[in-house]
Amino acid sequence: MEYMILWFFFVVSLISIFFWIRKQPIKDWIIVFFLKAFLSGFVDSFIVAYKLLEYPIRPFPEVFQIEILFDLMVFPILCVFYNQTSYNSGFKGILLQAILYSLPMSAIEYWGVKNTRLIVYHHWNIGMTSLFLVITFLMVRGIIALIRKYSKP
């Protein structure tokens, strides 16, 4: 069952690329994607190394201790969608959307903890996941805003 879930998220992620890649400015979305992937993978490496949580079933377990599908694909794609929908929003809209985007992913993770062997919490909880997602969404949103501001001629 766990591998079917991973395949489902992989296929949905691949399909969703065709939706976000067509919107302009495409270079911004590519930067957002790779920045979020870097942040998620980097932070998750520490979280796993300090045994706050673990991923017993994951792609390429002999190479990666982190859940690369979510860290390097699902979360970055979700962050691109977040940046696209909050593109013209004010601060309140940006913050509210960051919270709203983090809630479904947190709920999915919580379901995964309770019903699968994809993720096991040791010294971690759903609130920490939600907070991590909101903070990284806002960080990436802020960084891309700075890039836009200082890259204009």
What is the predicted function of each stretch?
Residues 1-153:
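Aromatic-rich, lipid-facing transmembrane alpha helices and their immediate juxtamembrane interface loops
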